[in-house]
């Protein structure tokens, strides 16, 4: 069967308001990995969303927050995987928010809320893309897997535990990692790596008095000077 992508794009355009509202629903649900706030409610919301596109999601327990796994069969024996996460960072400091962090407020054509950019937009876009493809053609061109974890924002401490316990679930011919970059009119960019996390606590000691006027005590250096170097 020949799949014309323009038909899928047209369907997405016709249902754009519906898909945007779905993203706003995800953003309205707190899911802070560090504190556990809203995690179980978010897990259920993601599972319901995957059920809505024809999948049978599994909630796989880990020592921390669960991993959600789902699979949909396609037309051939090739399998493509989507890695995403449903957790977000804390919302502090609250006084810097123009609108409440879970309001998913729309201003000037953009949605504002915790997690709208990292990574609930990525999760929503993939679910909506699969939904649109199935609505247009009734099937998918390849098998699709969803691996959605809930601890990415704290360094994915239990993703390796999941991977070692369920290697067969991770078997795919290719993967899409949570987000991506695509400039208008250009093909999607392929990245070969990503930065990790580094936390440093630095203590330093300098002279009590200026000994060379051209070199004042290092402790007088503004804290920002340590950043971005």
Which residues are covered by each model-predicted region?
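A structural signal for well-ordered alpha-helical segments within the folded catalytic domains
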Residues: 17, 44, 124, 224-228
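Acidic/histidine-rich catalytic neighborhood of metal-dependent amide-processing enzymes
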Residues: 117-193
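Short small-residue beta-strand/loop micro-motif enriched in glycine and branched aliphatics
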Residues: 111-113, 208-214
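Acidic/His- and Gly-rich active-site-bordering loop/insert found
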Residues: 2-116, 135-142
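Flexible glycine/proline-rich, aromatic-decorated loop/lid segments
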Residues: 189-205
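Acidic-enriched catalytic cores of C-N bond-cleaving enzymes acting on peptides and small amides
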Residues: 167, 182-183, 192, 212-229
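Fold-independent oxyanion-binding glycine-rich loops
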Residues: 84-86, 108, 150-151, 178-180, ...
């Amino acid at each position: 069967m020949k799949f014309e992508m323009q038909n899928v794009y047209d369907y997405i355009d016709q249902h754009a308001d519906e898909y945007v509202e779905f993203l706003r629903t995800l953003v309205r649900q707190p899911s802070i990995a560090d504190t556990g706030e809203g995690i179980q409610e978010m897990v259920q919301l993601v599972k319901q969303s995957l059920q809505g596109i024809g999948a049978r999601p599994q909630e796989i327990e880990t020592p921390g927050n669960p991993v959600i796994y789902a699979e949909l069969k396609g037309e051939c024996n090739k399998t493509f995987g989507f890695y995403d996460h449903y957790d977000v960072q804390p919302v502090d400091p609250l006084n810097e928010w123009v609108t409440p962090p879970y309001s998913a407020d729309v201003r000037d054509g953009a949605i504002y809320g915790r997690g709208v950019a990292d990574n609930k937009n990525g999760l929503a876009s993939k679910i909506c893309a699969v939904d649109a493809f199935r609505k247009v053609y009734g099937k998918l061109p390849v098998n699709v897997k969803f691996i959605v974890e809930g601890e990415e924002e704290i360094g994915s401490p239990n993703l390796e535990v999941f991977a070692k316990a369920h290697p067969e679930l991770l078997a795919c011919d290719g993967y899409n990692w949570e987000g991506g970059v695509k400039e208008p009119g250009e093909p999607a960019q392929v990245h070969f790596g990503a930065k990790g996390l580094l936390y440093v606590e630095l203590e330093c000691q300098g002279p009590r008095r200026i000994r060379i006027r051209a070199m004042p005590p290092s402790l007088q250096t503004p804290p920002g000077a340590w950043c971005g170097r």
